[in-house]
């Protein structure tokens, strides 16, 4: 595949057999421009501020696009009727790898399918749950801005097991809490057989052993419905779809039955006939679980710049993020906090600097890479009057009390952070990360979802992920521009084809700096 792509790239951009001649011209062009730049810049050093401004422009545009959630409109009250499904293999705390297919009906009843897998690509099914019940929407949430509260009742839950090893483990675990619940004499559960977990639909019947399975559907307690509209360059027209956000689940499985959600899980997308992935999930059921195709797994290389893809919800505020990774194990982070789910009303922003370790493959979460992040410098910028008052009332543990003014940043490193917003320095945090190629070929970076238990935040390695960040500047870490095949080298253009992208970028950067200097 790589060879084929290189051949097409060479034919299109390098002119086949003329690649050496064109490549030599390109190198010469770069050298001439670099010499011009060196002669124009004092001490032969590029102006780091110009380079920085150039690298930030795309990222800054994306952040401005998120401020106000351009192209996103809230649907009030939520339109639940219809079929909703996961758009990727979701990683839940635990970890659990899951695909969801939820149906809500006009009579307030629902039929929900949850498919669980033993792998992070949702290719090897372990078991599934089919949940039936009713849901009633309530008032706007006082806890999570933009969410609608709901009350639900589960009437029946059935389970189908697909994996023999998982079935044996589940049977032993459940029978410890509910002796005899799985009453077969064998230690194994029958595969592709429906087991009854809850049944309140039959009069006089009572079956419930959900506590042993850490089962809860409290995600139905808060609901948010959004309509997304964006321009499709492929179709040359605007396209729209709906997304459904349901409540988050506790990161400690044993606490799920007692936790009331305050944030969201990844959104579900409403079924559309022109959505091929939707169609694929739509055609599955408990005896025919969805099996996703294999995807490339990328090594997590922390470099370049990354920015939020949406206005993200937190348990207190909403946030957009901009992370910058350097090649010397240092990093910077910009965090912009808002009062509202459209990220229109700013509260404060934080700028931090620190270091990070090299990554190690996670033993707990398949496909994940673990890091240790240290934050040792911090600046805070209050962006509304209430936040200024809050910071000015500190006990000299968040810069000097009374020194804060709106939209003026202050460093809080000397006071070891800022107690008013609950941050201490230096701060060490265990991280989990993974990378994937998103829609349209954009690299995505997922970093860990911290523990719901505040006392454990940063101390334990996450087992699930936050909303992804999108690559916005710097070298694309998912493009390998150095590896060439033997056949390429025999044609005499392998190394040149591989380095053409790098040379093009050097040429562009040199020209831009020279242009700005004059």
Region annotations inferred by a language model:
Residues 1-21:
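N-terminal secretory signal peptides that target proteins for export/translocation
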Residues 42-99, 111, 135-136, 245, ...:
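Tryptophan-anchored aromatic micro-motifs
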Residues 21-40, 503-513:
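Cleavable N-terminal signal peptides of Sec/SRP-targeted secreted and luminal proteins
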Residues 474, 478-504:
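C-terminal GPI-anchoring signal of eukaryotic secretory precursors
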Residues 111-113, 150-154, 237-253, 332-334, ...:
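Short, hydrophobic/proline-enriched secondary-structure or compact coil segments at domain edges
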Residues 46-50, 67-69, 75-80, 90-174, ...:
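N-terminal glycine/threonine-rich, aromatic-flanked beta-hairpin/loop signature
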Residues 153-224, 374-431:
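Mixed-charge, low-complexity intrinsically disordered segments
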Residues 57, 87, 120, 176, ...:
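Extracellular secreted precursors and ectodomains with disulfide-bonded cysteine-rich loops/domains
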């Amino acid at each position: 595949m790589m060879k084929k792509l290189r051949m097409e790239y060479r034919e299109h951009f390098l002119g086949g057999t003329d690649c050496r001649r064109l490549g030599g011209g390109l190198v010469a062009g770069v050298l001439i421009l670099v010499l011009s730049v060196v002669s124009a810049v004092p001490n032969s050093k590029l102006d780091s501020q110009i380079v920085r401004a150039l690298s930030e422009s795309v990222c800054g545009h994306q952040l401005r696009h998120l401020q106000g959630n351009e192209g996103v409109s809230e649907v009030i009250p939520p339109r639940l009727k219809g079929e909703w499904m996961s758009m990727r293999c979701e990683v839940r705390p635990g970890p659990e790898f899951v695909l969801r297919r939820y149906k809500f009906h006009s009579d307030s009843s629902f039929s929900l399918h949850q498919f669980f897998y033993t792998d992070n690509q949702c290719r090897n099914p372990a078991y599934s749950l089919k949940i039936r019940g009713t849901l009633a929407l309530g008032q706007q949430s006082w806890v999570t801005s933009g969410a609608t509260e709901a009350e639900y009742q589960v009437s029946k839950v059935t389970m189908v097991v697909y994996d023999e090893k998982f079935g044996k483990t589940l049977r032993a675990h459940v029978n410890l809490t509910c002796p005899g619940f799985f009453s077969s004499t064998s230690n194994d559960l029958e595969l592709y057989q429906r087991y009854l977990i809850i049944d309140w639909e039959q009069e006089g019947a009572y079956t419930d052993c959900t506590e042993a399975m850490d089962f809860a559907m409290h995600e139905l307690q808060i609901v948010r419905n959004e309509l997304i509209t964006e321009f499709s360059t492929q179709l040359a027209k605007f396209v729209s779809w709906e997304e459904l956000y349901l409540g988050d689940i506790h990161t400690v499985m044993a606490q799920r039955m007692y936790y009331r959600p305050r944030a969201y899980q990844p959104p579900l997308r409403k079924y559309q006939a022109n959505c091929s992935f939707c169609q694929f999930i739509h055609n599955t059921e408990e005896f025919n679980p969805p099996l996703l195709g294999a995807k490339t797994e990328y090594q997590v290389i922390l470099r370049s710049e990354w920015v939020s893809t949406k206005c993200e919800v937190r348990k207190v505020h909403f946030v957009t993020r901009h992370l910058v990774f350097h090649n010397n194990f240092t990093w910077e982070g910009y965090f912009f906090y808002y009062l509202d789910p459209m990220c229109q009303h700013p509260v404060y922003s934080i700028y931090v600097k620190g270091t990070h370790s090299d990554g190690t493959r996670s033993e707990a979460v398949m496909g994940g890479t673990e890091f240790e992040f240290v934050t040792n410098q911090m600046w805070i910028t209050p962006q509304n009057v209430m936040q200024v008052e809050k910071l000015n009332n500190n006990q000299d543990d968040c810069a000097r009390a009374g020194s804060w003014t709106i939209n003026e940043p202050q460093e809080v490193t000397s006071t070891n952070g800022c107690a008013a917003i609950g941050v201490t320095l230096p701060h060490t945090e265990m991280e989990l990360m993974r990378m994937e190629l998103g829609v349209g070929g954009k690299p995505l970076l997922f970093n860990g979802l911290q523990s719901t238990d505040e006392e454990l935040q940063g101390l334990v390695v996450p087992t699930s992920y936050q909303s992804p960040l999108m690559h916005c500047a710097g070298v694309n870490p998912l493009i390998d521009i150095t590896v060439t095949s033997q056949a390429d080298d025999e044609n005499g253009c392998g190394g040149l084809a591989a380095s053409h992208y790098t040379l093009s970028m050097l040429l562009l950067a040199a020209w831009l700096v020279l242009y700005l200097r004059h």
